[in-house]
Amino acid sequence: MTPPLFHIGEVVATHGVFTHLEQHRIAAFPYLRRHACGDWGMVPPEDAAANRFAVEHGARVLSSYDIAGKRVWIITEADRGMTTLLFPDEY
C-alpha cells in the first residue's frame, strides 16, 4: 500500500457532503486515503501538477472525485491542519 504523501490534519465535511455520504452508506476514508497518497481523482493535468508542487512546498492540495453521482472535492489546507470534503458549489 502506498504511504501517505502528507498529513491531512482534522477532517471535516460540509453538511451536504456528510448527508450525501450517509444516505448512500459510503465511507469517506477510502477517498481521504487516495487524496493523501497522491491519487487526486478527476483533476485536470495542471491541477495534478499544482498538487505535486503543493506536496513538496506546503501549499493547498485539491482532489476531486465522483461519489454516488455527485462531484466531491477534498481540500487539505497548506498548513496541513485541516482537510475538508465539500461540493464544488460550496467552495
Locations of regions flagged by a protein language model:
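Compact soluble domain cores
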Residues: 2-61
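Short, compact, well-ordered microdomains
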Residues: 57-91
